[in-house]
Every structure is written in C-alpha cells, then in structure tokens.
Amino acid sequence: MSLPSIGSVGSDRMAAYMHGQQVYTGQFGDPNLTPPQAETQMSAQASAQAVGQEPEPDYKLVIRQEPQRARVAQGKEKGTDRKPIDPPPIVQLIRTARSDPAQIYLQSPYYFMACTLIKGSDDDPDPNPNSMLGTLVSSLHKLRDLNNEDGGFFIFGDLSIKIEGVFRLQFTLFQMKDSTCVFLDSATSQPFTVYPQKNFEGMAESTFLTRSFSDQGVRLRVRKDSRAMTTRKRNHQHAEVAKKHSEWDRKQTSAVSRHSSINENDSTPTDTRGLASFAGAGSSGYYDQHRSHYGETYGHDTYYGGARSVKRARHEVSPGQYALPDLPQQAYATRQPSFSDSVASMTMPPVTTAAPSLAGINPMSSHHGYTGSAHPGFAPHRINTQVGGSHLAPQPHSAIGSVNQGYQSPSTHHQPHPHTAHPAGGQAYPSPSPRQSPGTAPNYHYGSHHSQQTPVSLGLETYTSAGVVGMPGPGQLVGTSAPSPHLGQGYRHGMINEPGA
C-alpha cells in the first residue's frame, strides 16, 4: 500500500477550502464583509428583487431651498451692489445606512459640489457657460438641521447671473479619490427668472433655514425685511406718532376752551393773552410744515393732515374770547407811569376834577421819580363828607412841605395866601404858583423822607376831623363846584376845585 504524496494532499485541501467559500458566499454574501453588514446587504437585495425594483443608491441629493428670483449682474458692481440669487440655493447630501451606517461622510473633506447654469426649458437655447459670477463650488458643511439632527449641506450664498431670462441650476456631486475626481450624483433645480435692474422687485426676507445656518457660522446675507416691508412699517410708525400728537392737541384745545368759558362767567376781566398764545401754539409748530404730506400719506384726519382739524381748533379757540379791557390812554399820552401810579390805580378809581392846591408843596420834580397822582392833572383825594361837607381830608404833605422849603425852584415866586394861618414861629408857608397846567400834576419831593410811604401815595383814604398844621380851614375853601358829569354813579359828591381856577 503506497502513501499519498504531499502535493496531492495540498491540492485536495485547497479544493475543499474553495468549496467552502462558495457555499458561505451563497448563504451569507461577500466573505470580506462582517456578518452584520453581510446580512443587511443580503436582506436589502432580497427585498428589492422580490418587489421588482432597483436597489436604493448609496448617495441621494435633496434640494432644500430652491432659487426663485435674481437680478442681472453687470460684473462691475462693488461690495453689496451685486445682488445674489434669492434665496440662496441649499442642497443636502444623504447617504444610506447600508453604505455608511456610522455617517462618517459628514466629516469627510473629499466631497464637493459644482453649480452650472442650464436652460429653463427644452425650447430655450443653452446659455453661455461664462454667464455666472460668484462662488460656483461649495464644500460639504456639517450643520444641525431644523429637526435638531446633523446633516451634510452644500450652500451657494454668492451666485449671480449676467444675462436675463428663465434658467435652471444643475448641481453635480464629486468625490476625490487618490488623484482622481469621481462623479457621484447630480440634481436640477426648478426654473427661475433673472430680471433686469429696473424690473427687479428687491430681495425678500431671509428664510428660517437661512437664518439658522447663518447663526451656525455660514457666511450668508441675512435680511430682516425687504425694502417695501420696511417702508410700510416706517409709515405705520409715523401714523402712530401722528395719532398720538392729534390726541394730545385735542386735549389741550378742550382744556383751553373750558378755561375760556370760566373767564366768560367771571365778572373780573382776566388777561388771558398767555392762554391765547398757548392755544395758538397748539395748532402750529414744526409738524404743521408737513401736515399736508402726512395727511395724503395716511388718508385720515390727523394732526398733520387736512385743514379740517386745524380749522376746528381755531374755531374752538377764538381770539375774540380773550379781548382785553379798555385802558385809559390819557396817562400814556402825557408822561411815563411811575411806581406810585401803579399802586394808586389798583385801589382808587380815576378822578376827573382838579386837585386842590396845598400850601408848602414843592412843585419841583423829584429826583426819585415819585409822583402824587395816578393820572396827569388829577389828584386822588376825596372829601370827608361824613364829618362835614366842606372839610378836606388831612394831607400829610403839608407837614413835609416845611422840610423841603430849601429845595424850591428859584424861578417860582410864592405869595402867602390871605387866609392861611401862620405857625408859631411867625413864618408863613409859601403857597404854590397861582395856576398850573392841567396836564401836569404837582410832583412831591420827599427829600430824605422818600422811604416813608404816605397814605395818599399808597392809595388809601384818611378820614379824621382833626386839622393839620398848614392846611386851609373850612372858611378858606374857594370855588366849590359839583362833580363832572363824566364821573360814575358811585362817585362821592363834594370835590373841591383848585383855588383860583
């Protein structure tokens, strides 16, 4: 019995090994794959063959954001003058779990996508390959999707077209392997229109997907609102401001109207020039220059628009409601008013009869500007009719006149009155000039006693039966006459004219 050779034994073992590989491949698939992957591949192929469909491809492209409009780019624009395609096209790359269950492709730098311009329909001619500007190639970006899951996206945020018409974009996916570039898949967008500059409506507001990717670091132009939307919002804000000003103006006008009605019911005249000017200011101002423009813009009666609101305010606040009382004009025609004039005019009515001349009064003008009557030519002195019809009210100026004898004008000659009683020293008090001009009242010179205000200068009436040194007695009064017919009904009778008149 001969033994088998070593070569024959090796060949038999090799044949048995190959037979086992064939059986394993027929049952479990490719032996180079791990058992779980082999089972997945076998199940996918078996299901596809059972249904009669082709197996699912390893790569899938989904256009997440389609281009809609664009403006023609001249190629000479600088910076933001060149408008890109709106909205920016975004393409997502999806790989099946069978081909890459760990989703390692999201970290791969070897995937990239190129964008080309093609005709919008079959009847249109093919565009020039050099009709596009900007960044035509995009690498893969790993970004978080709206569903909070990671994904791979190709973003074209800087694409412009130099010709008008209707076109489509073709996106082609490539992969770098060693020193070669391998084509993987492609996708085509929907047709969109490229408008000339004069017909372009403007860039629309950025989509939520664009904002989300911009927040994650992708360089994209984010627009909050379009120009048309911004203009509408601005006009709405101006309308709100105009409405507030109109309400405030109506409140001020009603307040002035109520105040004017109160003044009409009051018997005391009130100077309301300040309120009248305030009411006039309510219907005028800076915004009145633009009220016609705002009225045409907003289409309703506001503070700025329409003459109806302004006329209503002027009608409610009429200047005639604030008429001032008539003031005497004679005091302003002859001389300037003084401090004592204003004090006397507040408490005493004007007197139309001449003032009696008193002995010892200095006719010189006071260097302090104090005068003795509220109106020129009149003296605010009244007769005490309660004690006697021919008694004058005591005048404290007669006592002061003896102090001011040295300040009398040298050109004035005084003669003693025949009925004037002499004081104890035997010296007669000089009397004023026989007649003075009716337009000028005697000015009282107080000298060193100018700080002492007399009852007459303060507009007060003094009633007493006692006489004063230097005052004329009851028998010395000359020229008693009735009051002027121009006086009021409430005026007391018994005024005395100036002696010698």
From Swiss-Prot:
It holds the Pfam family Velvet. Its main location: nucleus. Forms a heterodimeric complex with VELB; the formation of the VELB-VOSA complex is light-dependent. The N-terminal velvet domain contains a NF-kappa-B-like fold and is involved in DNA-binding. One of its GO terms (biological process) is sporulation resulting in formation of a cellular spore. It comes from Pyricularia oryzae (strain 70-15 / ATCC MYA-4617 / FGSC 8958). Belongs to the velvet family. VosA subfamily. This is Spore development regulator VOSA. The keyword Transcription regulation applies. A motif (Nuclear localization signal) lies at residues 364-371. One of its GO terms (cellular component) is nucleus. Residues 26-55, 67-88, 228-274, 378-455, 474-501 are annotated as: Disordered. Residues 52-223 form the Velvet domain. It is found in: Nucleus. Residues 35-50, 253-271 have a biased composition (Polar residues). Gene3D superfamilies: Velvet domain. The keyword Nucleus applies. Component of the VELB-VOSA heterodimeric complex that plays a dual role in activating genes associated with spore maturation and repressing certain development-associated genes. The complex binds DNA through the DNA-binding domain of VOSA that recognizes an 11-nucleotide consensus sequence 5'-CTGGCCGCGGC-3' consisting of two motifs in the promoters of key developmental regulatory genes. Appears dispensable for the development and pathogenicity.
